[in-house]
Amino acid sequence: MSNSLSNTVPPDLSAQPENPGEWPKSDFNCATIKALIDAFQRWLGEAFDSGIAAERLIEARTEFIDQLLQRLWVEYGFGSINDIALVAVGGYGRGELHPLSDIDLLILSRKKLPDEQAQKVGERLALLWDIKLEVGHSVRTLEECLLEGLSDLSVATNLIESRLLIGDVALFLELQKHIFSDGFWPSEKFFAAKVEEQNDRHQRYHGTSYNLEPDVKSSPGGLRDIHTLQWIARRHFGATSLDEMVGFGFLTEAERNELNECLHQLWRIRFALHLELNRYDNRLLFDRQFSVARRLRYEGESNQPIEHMMKDFFRVTRRVSELNQMLIQLFEEAILALTEDEKPRPIDDDFQLRGTLIDLRDDTLFIREPQAILRMFYTMVRNSSITGIYSTTVRHLRHARRHLTQPLCYIPEARTLFLSMLRHQGGLSRGLLPMHRHSVLWAYMPQWSHIVGQMQFDLFHAYTVDEHTIRVLLKLESFAKEETRSRHPLWLELWPRLTHPELILIAALFHDIAKGAGGDHSILGAQDVLKFAELHGLNCAQTQLVAWLVRHQLLMSVTAQRRDIQDPEVIKQFAEEVQTENRLHYLVCLTVADICATNENLWNSWKQSLLRELYFATEKQLRRGMQNTPDMRERVRHHQLQALALLRMENINEQALHQIWNRCRANYFVRHTPNQLAWHARNLLKHDLSKPMILLSSHATRGGTEIFIWSPDRPYLFAAVSAELDRRNLSVHDAQIFTTRDGMAMDTFIVLEPDGSPLSADRTQMIRVGLEQTLSQRSWQPPAPRRQAAKLRHFSVPTEVNFLPTHTDRKSFLELIALDQPGLLARVGQVFADLGISLHGARITTIGERVEDLFIIATADRRALNNELQQEVQQRLTEALNPNDKG
């Protein structure tokens, strides 16, 4: 696995700045200290930019602060006091001071300090804050240190890393003797606590470093994972460096070199990040990634510097994670010792069990027979009691991986084993997932290497391409489990209908395999999967299905979210693309898994309702036949009769009902369900129809809260309502805009809270009052523009306005792609009203920082827009959505 920084420019080492960090022998006042600190911080940036290694600069800052604190200690008279010492702890104790790292100090005394000395310590610490040093400190006696350390793991860890700066050497050595004694956090207890702490930390980051805004220090595979190894080794073995761990036999020299390389690469990124910030933080947030990448000399156009940097970062964290898990196991064996149950038990001629971990019986097997690597993972799939790979076997696997002469998929037995894994229940979670974690998926199929660590610079994708793909596979596997029913009932019913589930898994493996390769990744991925299918012996029908799924992976998602799926013609066109119910079953399962695995917040009841609606409508169309589409009048009658049946149960006035319905146009009945029609009618019959009425559904309708508005129609009504909903922080996902024959607006909005849930009950009255005030206003006043969300300011989405082909001359379909921004719908509505254009429907889709909306519009006389008006709309919308000042 290559980890060279191939997209960086080497620095010019010919003119490195001179270190200003020499403390004056006299004139040691606050202003002098602050000036020298500022000069030193500037030098750190200049030195880093000139090519001096981060580890040298970290060492230089540590030494610089050491000298300052030692000088201050003497200057203020502490040097002559016995039984007191100044001790560096935490990261400072390790000697790991980045530009913005906290300076953690312990003022250690044998007995409680007299009030006068305690006051003097407080005054001197205040001076450090005055000169803008981020100092964390504690003042403790030896006894207090030990008591605090025994009760608090973080205090104990800080003490284990302690380093004497100046003061009573004997006192410090006494502290060291106590904290490394068996009575102070015995090795077994410390090891177990640190492993639990690491597991908890990993869980906070969803178990992966592959979140696209990772924490360089705390994400899985980050610096903390290396620190954890160092802490455990320090406590148990007394090892103060990776070199000493080699001496104890717990690291090979190659592993030591690899960990050092990873450590220095992570230091380099963290150092550059700190130079770009004013306040301590270790998160590579989107708005920082470009400047950090440039500082690290990554090159390329547009977002390429970011993608190259993050790819290097993610590949480093992958290596750290694997080494961390392997060494944790080795520590466990050494510290906790094997129990009788953990003695090896044979599985077959090749493998044995140590506890619940699979282990090699012959250390040379993977080198002699590379296909045995796949045999091991298939054994893990077939035996659900195996929870992982034994540490020494991981070491042999890593060694064999580096000595492979060809991809594993070129070995016939390996191909057979790989397909067997895909066909086996649990084959993904127990086989492909660990293969991915140990870089064997990369070794098996060469295409996988291109997407490992591949990020996309947007707010839509939460994970790298490889991590997303693995999550798609795991989501698909979950459709076979009964516990998934509450969240995905339909897909659970469909899964058993897939005649060859392994085919959808192959399609999932390849659906994003060509991301970042240039060109349409769906087309390129379909070409790649054809080669895979041929190599693995799939028959013609199976090959065609997986290639079709990869090629059309976005078809259902785009149709459901960005097309008018209540239009029979749209359903017919979609059904013509799908062709068979079998394809439909595969496609809907892949689509749902893809959405769920893209971003944890992306899947909601609204998207589920859209996909269900499209699925059932397409299923009906396929069973009916392509030549038969439902007649509009037939659909109107059907919906009216079903709604009437519901209303008759309540003894409504049918004559009054028909008077209301006679005012409505046919589209109103087609685009609402019978339940919606009955709900509207039930309330309209009790209402003075000359006055506005606002209804908010108490139960989710089509996955969201339905807001129904009855009001005299007027220009800018849609813009005004949209502005009010935006002001209330509601997301509009669908709008149906109707006008009765006598000029009353009957508008329906499906809205969700920002977290994707229906409107919370405690907000209903507030929303209703706000809308009532909006309807009472006679004229339209555009709202004052709100500031754009901070995250969005770092993204750019060119506004695109496209008119889609249509089968009718009575309406136009406008597709809008733009940067998400406050008040977008209101601005769109204002443009339509300015141009005298009627809005009949809207489908609103927000994908991260990007909106992809569909608007159904017509002229005032209910005709499609001509070319001239289309051009005017394009120009006005582009101007409205690209203001010079984004706030």
Curated annotation (Swiss-Prot):
Q: Name one GO biological process term.
A: regulation of nitrogen utilization
Q: Which residues form the HD domain?
A: 465-587
Show the Gene3D superfamilies listed in the entry.
Answer: Hypothetical protein af1432
Q: Which SUPFAM superfamilies match?
A: ACT-like, HD-domain/PDEase-like, Nucleotidyltransferase, Nucleotidyltransferase substrate binding subunit/domain, Poly A polymerase C-terminal region-like
Disruption phenotype annotation: Cells lacking this gene are unable to uridylylate PII and are altered in adenylation/deadenylation of glutamine synthetase.
Annotated region (Uridylyltransferase), positions in chain: 1-346
Q: Which reaction does it catalyse?
A: [protein-PII]-L-tyrosine + UTP = [protein-PII]-uridylyl-L-tyrosine + diphosphate; [protein-PII]-uridylyl-L-tyrosine + H2O = [protein-PII]-L-tyrosine + UMP + H(+)
Please name the NCBIfam families in this protein's record. PRK01759.1 (NF002487), PRK05007.1 (NF003448), UTase_glnD (TIGR01693)
This protein is called what?
Answer: Bifunctional uridylyltransferase/uridylyl-removing enzyme
Species for this entry: Klebsiella oxytoca
Gene field:
glnD
